[in-house]
Swiss-Prot record:
Residues 226-237 have a biased composition (Basic and acidic residues). InterPro entries: NS1 (IPR004208), NS1A (IPR000256), NS1A_effect_dom-like_sf (IPR038064), uS15_NS1_RNA-bd_sf (IPR009068). It comes from the Viruses. GO terms for molecular function: protein serine/threonine kinase inhibitor activity; RNA binding. A motif (Nuclear localization signal) lies at residues 34-38. Residues 180-215 are annotated as: CPSF4-binding. The dsRNA-binding region is required for suppression of RNA silencing. Homodimer. Interacts with host TRIM25 (via coiled coil); this interaction specifically inhibits TRIM25 multimerization and TRIM25-mediated RIGI CARD ubiquitination. Interacts with human EIF2AK2/PKR, CPSF4, IVNS1ABP and PABPN1. Residues 223-230 are annotated as: PABPN1-binding. It holds the Pfam family Flu_NS1. This is Non-structural protein 1.
Amino acid sequence: MDPNTVSSFQVDCFLWHVRKQVADQELGDAPFLDRLRRDQKSLKGRGSTLGLDIETATCVGKQIVERILKEESDEALKMTMASAPASRYLTDMTIEEMSRDWFMLMPKQKVAGPLCVRMDQAIMDKNIILKANFSVIFDRLETLILLRAFTEEGAIVGEISPLPSLPGHTNEDVKNAIGVLIGGLEWNDNTVRVSKTLQRFAWRSSNENGRPPLTPKQKRKMARAIRSEVRRNKMAD
């Protein structure tokens, strides 16, 4: 096992413990508490994958952090913080929308890289909007916290969430997972739109219907589907 993987996990465990103490003293805001819950699930998954005990890892992580802080001067710390880019946390959904339980009549689940896509295939002929809570850095989506698909009535019919056992994902991973979700929902004649916030930071552009632009792969797939439909119609005639 890569020692850097182990030490990274140990430090993450200790830093989560520190953040938990902040939350226990009621010093964290809603985004802070949201990330805390998500990171807890991620650490449990990583611990299971690595075969490491979280409590033991937290103690070792504390030693690593204390050693670094002891060796680092205040001036070096100030320079590091000044040069580090700051990320922003953006929210399409309220805490209630993020934490609400939902169920599927015809469940479908697919793993798209480090992300899990879930949707209800029983939903048909609905207008659906995708909302997400995520962090942004350099005006690009950095980390997806949670994405959910809502009908006009407010019902949740789909979701994309990071897999706890596979931490870390890219902007492209998120776009691919959204493509899977949109494709699954549109298969049943639903009309899907993406929130303006998600359009801006995931794609930086969209068409007039609020849809993200199709990738070359998606365009080729659509062209094949259209050609196939045309051939079937000619044979029927």
